[in-house]
Every structure is written in structure tokens, then in C-alpha cells.
């Protein structure tokens, strides 16, 4: 008895897929090989479709020169540049002609002809760490080596034709005295100041008695002064009047 395997149902044919080109393992090398083959045969290269992996539905065609042909184009450019450089003729060096001297203006007076008061030697005298005096020796308190020395003035090629200007007199040459000690080692001032006078002994304030008027006492003293000014007769009359009033008052009280 023979056992037969059940035959599987026939699978339906798969639907037709669009043409996706030829799959190659190394598409870049394949392109280079095909281009070299077309270049050697002399035929115009037809646009080829190369399918890269992981792109099953997209087709690409090479349009224009690729970046792989840049080496050949660069070498061709260098050869053309060398060829063009051979065509250009190098210019011959021209000889330089000396310029004629300019004619000076008749009314121009050079500034060297007028002596400037600041053309003398300038000196520097540090006064404090943040202040320094710069000026001629007449301004400073002592002479030191100059900072800027104007020894001579520039001589003009052509003398001035205009009338000379009246400038200040030239200063006499100054003599320089070297100052070996720096400012930090200068001795201190030799002036001696007198000590302040000692304080006076005893209290400096004098106590004066001050009398404060008392208005109550004055009111009490005023009747006494008025009584002393009255005569004895007037006093007797006033006392009699006061006694009679007191007597009448007592009588009226007793009678009541």
C-alpha cells in the first residue's frame, strides 16, 4: 500500500511587477565600467537606470556630468591654463622717469621759517603717581634730560619769496644738568615747624553771675516803694478811714 502526499493546491501566479532594472552589487563601479566601455567604443552613452538597494520603486537616470568626472575636468582646465599662459607675452619692464621738481607758489611761506614756541626741548616732571607735568624748563622746578629734542629744522629746497613774518625770538640753547637720584630717593623737607602752643591751665570759660528777675518779688516790693513815697499825714488819714470802715462793719453785724 503506497502512501501519497497530499498535493498542495496550485498557487495563483503573482501579479506582474514593473521593471526595476538590473540589481548590481556595487552600482558605482558598474556605472564607471559602463562609462569607460562607452567612451572606448565612441558611442554616445545611453541613459541607464540603476536600482540601488532599499529603493524598490524609484528609478533614477544620470543627468549631466557626475562628480566622478571632476578629476578629468580639473586636469583639462590646468592644461588649458598652461597653454593660455604660453600665449600671453610678458610685458617688458618700463624705465622710470624722474619727476621734475615742482615750482613753489610765490605766496607760500613754509612753517619752518616761523619759529614755534613749542620747538624747544620738552621736559617731564612727575609730580605724583597719577600726574606728570610736561613742558619747557622754565615751567618745571628742576632740569632733567629732555623728552623731545628738536635739534635742527628741516631746510627748505627753495627759500620763501614772500615777506618774512615777525616771529618770537629764538630761545637760547639750554644746558642740561643730570639728575642721578630718582624722585623716590629725594630727601624729605628740611623745614622745621614750631610745635603748637600748650593748652592754657585752668578752665577756659569765666563764670559770670547772672541775675534772673523774679516778677513775684517785684509785685510785692511795689506797694512798699509807694508807701515810702507817701507822707505821714496821708498814711494817718488812710488808717483812720480803714478803722471807721471796720467799726461800721462790726456794728452792722452785731445789730443784725
From Swiss-Prot:
GO CC terms:
RNA polymerase II transcription regulator complex
Q: Where is this region: Disordered?
A: 1-23
Cell compartment(s), UniProt = Nucleus
Q: One of this protein's Pfam families, by short name?
A: PD-C2-AF1
- Span of domain OCA: 16-38
Record note on quaternary structure? Interacts with POU2F1/OCT1 and POU2F2/OCT2; the interaction increases POU2F1 and POU2F2 transactivation activity.
Which PANTHER family does the UniProt entry name for this protein? Answer: POU DOMAIN CLASS 2-ASSOCIATING FACTOR 1
What's in the domain note? In the N-terminus possesses a conserved OCA domain for bivalent binding to class II POU domain-containing transcription factors and to an octamer DNA motif.
Q: What does this protein do?
A: Transcriptional coactivator that specifically associates with either POU2F1/OCT1 or POU2F2/OCT2. It boosts the POU2F1/OCT1 mediated promoter activity and to a lesser extent, that of POU2F2/OCT2. It recognizes the POU domains of POU2F1/OCT1 and POU2F2/OCT2. It is essential for the response of B-cells to antigens and required for the formation of germinal centers. Regulates IL6 expression in B cells as POU2F2/OCT2 coactivator.
Q: What is this protein called?
A: POU domain class 2-associating factor 1
Gene source species: Homo sapiens (Human)
What gene makes this protein? POU2AF1
